Amino acid sequence: MVENPLLKVLLDRKSVRKFKPTQVSREAVEQIVRTGQRAPTACRVEAYSFILVSDLEKRKQIVGATVGHAPTRRFMEEAPVWIMICTDFARQIKFLEMQGLKNEFSEVSKFMLGIIDAALAAENMVIAAEALGLGSCFVGSIWTAPKGVAEILNLPENVLPVVLLCIGHPDENPQTRSRWPLEAVLHENEYNMPDERLMLEHASARQNWEVSSPYKLPRDVEQRIRREWREQGFLI
């Protein structure tokens, strides 16, 4: 494998869930966000916004609306930096209106391209944090409470919370977690289902893992999330 410092940062990345109380400088936070902006973006729309959540009361409300008393709560409360990553078309729609142009975003493209833009920016930000010697962890359950988070952060229509990025100085050095073998995820010209040998090897590496709760949403919860997405202007 080619030796490269950037590749090393990428390959060594792991989620950190225990942080030192040391504050992260504003300069570092802004550098991380600027790095997020350098991610690829569809048609240069930059369909994202980043909300730095420093208000402790707002943090408490977000925890209550999303993770409740789950184990996730502890590392969220310890993390010095919270960055809420949102899909944002409100800014672009306003930008078009100021120029006398019509908003012609289709609902499907608005949802898909917005999520992709936000996700690409989020990954850039994680790598930037790693390069600065910081640890980070995503809180994915944010998307299960779009209305609650939107109300807490005063998000207008056409802005949707996607994921929360927690950042801080790491107070642990966890091992990198196993991934599927490359031959199970890299296909050429057509899809091939991994054979049973790879499946068993992967099961052994993951031990007692099971599909986590965000993938097991009850039907009524799924319907509620879809309704709240629509209320934020995303008709999926």
Provide a role label for each language-model segment:
Residues 1-236:
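Acidic, surface-exposed loops and disordered segments
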